[in-house]
Amino acid sequence: MKQAAIKPQITFDDFTKLDIRLGTIMGVDEVEKSDKLMKLTVDFGDHQRTILAGIKQERENPAEIEGLQALFVVNLPERKMAGEVSQGMLFDIGFEDKQLPCLAIPEKPMPNGCRAG
């Protein structure tokens, strides 16, 4: 496998600006106007968010991730896609390396809303 190139160096301050949190995927729904996006309802402990993720073609059954905990970037600006609004980004592994992506998940259950870093 040829790995993706390492991205340009960033400062530690740049890294600390990312707010990556653990959430439980409570729902996985179709986005009617997209052949790639699925709408995830994610529980972050003190609130829920809608996050659009391009997983429709990556998984035989996208709903299989319902109930799993995963990492999400939560401090991106809201983004409208295919008539829906996304309030963050799913943090997955493999896409940049042309691999079938998988979720970044904790090795044991942790409270929703916990920060990665």
Positions of predicted regions on the chain:
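Phosphate-backbone binding interfaces of nucleic-acid-interacting proteins
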Residues: 1-117
